[in-house]
A protein has these predicted regions:
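Class I SAM-dependent methyltransferase Rossmann-like catalytic core
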Residues: 2-57
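Class I SAM-dependent methyltransferase SAM/SAH-binding core
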Residues: 65, 69-113
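A short acidic, Gly/Pro-enriched loop at the edge of an enzyme's catalytic core
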Residues: 109-124
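A short SAM/SAH-binding and catalytic strip from SAM-dependent methyltransferases
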Residues: 123-134
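A short glycine-rich, Lys/Arg-flanked "PGG" loop and its adjoining helix->strand segment in the class I
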Residues: 137-152
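Conserved class I S-adenosyl-L-methionine
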Residues: 154-181
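Short alpha-helix
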Residues: 184-206, 210-212
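Core SAM-dependent methyltransferase catalytic element
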Residues: 203-207, 211-213, 218-251
Length: 251
């Protein structure tokens, strides 16, 4: 195993460990107030479904998969005929958030190795997931494989100025050789994608974009509202956390 490959696997595991710690703390915080979070989840799921259906209708009996459903994914209130979510931490989330996790079948597996037959789903959702995973491209390949011809993909990921990719690579290098200094935004992600790199994930796949959106120009224009620390100051120079969204059809 090469240094970079081993480092990537360690980053992916570290990102999962940090996410689980965060969600455990969140579960304790929202206990007894789940209704507020459920209302937010319902609104987000409806907004995304409306965005998809403005481009391509979803059948009432559609079989829907969410890759990286996480603790509060779209699938739980998406209104699917059959809804399935996959996430490496799914077994933990069923225990932490029983109020809604039971609304869909969830399977503890990463998006790089989906345990489904080819052409199994009418709709696949992947909402802000791939930059936390071991292989963003492999996830897109698997999504294309399990989508039925004519099926719909909803994909969203954060994109950033190229500065953050370079900084994340440097951070990964010193972590790989054992230096203990850890920067939180880089520890929570395996990769910081530029807009070009996010688009390149789709190259050569049997997917045709029906709708493509990004808010890079808006994020560049507005920047952070307040400068609270050095990271916010950097965002004024190098934009961070712009949205890139694709709604695509399987050819």
């Amino acid at each position: 195993m090469g240094l970079m490959t081993g480092g990537l696997e360690r980053r992916a595991k570290r990102a999962l460990d940090r996410q689980l710690d965060y969600q455990r703390a969140k579960a304790a915080k929202v206990k007894g107030h789940e209704d507020q979070l459920i209302a937010s989840m319902m609104a987000h799921s409806k907004a995304i479904r409306d965005r998809i259906e403005a481009v391509k209708p979803i059948a009432q009996d559609a079989r829907v998969l969410e890759v990286g459903c996480g603790a509060h994914g779209l699938i739980f209130f998406f209104g699917a005929g059959e809804g399935i979510g996959v996430d490496p931490l799914a077994d933990h989330y069923r225990t932490l958030f029983p109020a809604w996790q039971s609304r869909a079948e969830t399977i503890a597996v990463g998006g790089e190795t989906l345990p489904f037959d080819d052409a199994s789903f009418d709709v696949v959702l992947c909402d802000n997931v791939v930059d936390h995973a071991l292989s963003p491209r492999k996830i897109l390949e698997e999504i294309a494989r399990v989508l039925k011809p004519g099926g719909t993909l909803y994909f969203e990921v954060n994109v950033h100025h190229g500065f953050y990719h370079a900084a994340a690579t440097a951070h990964a290098a010193w972590r790989a050789i054992g230096l203990p200094f850890e920067i939180t935004p880089f520890a929570d992600h395996t990769v910081h994608l530029t807009l070009g790199a996010a688009r390149a994930l789709f190259e050569g796949l049997p997917l045709r974009a029906l709708s493509e959106f990004d808010d890079v120009d808006e994020v560049k224009r507005t920047g952070p509202k307040r400068v609270r620390h050095a990271g916010d100051a950097l965002k004024k120079l190098f934009f961070k956390n712009a949205r890139y969204e694709v709604i695509a059809v399987k050819l």
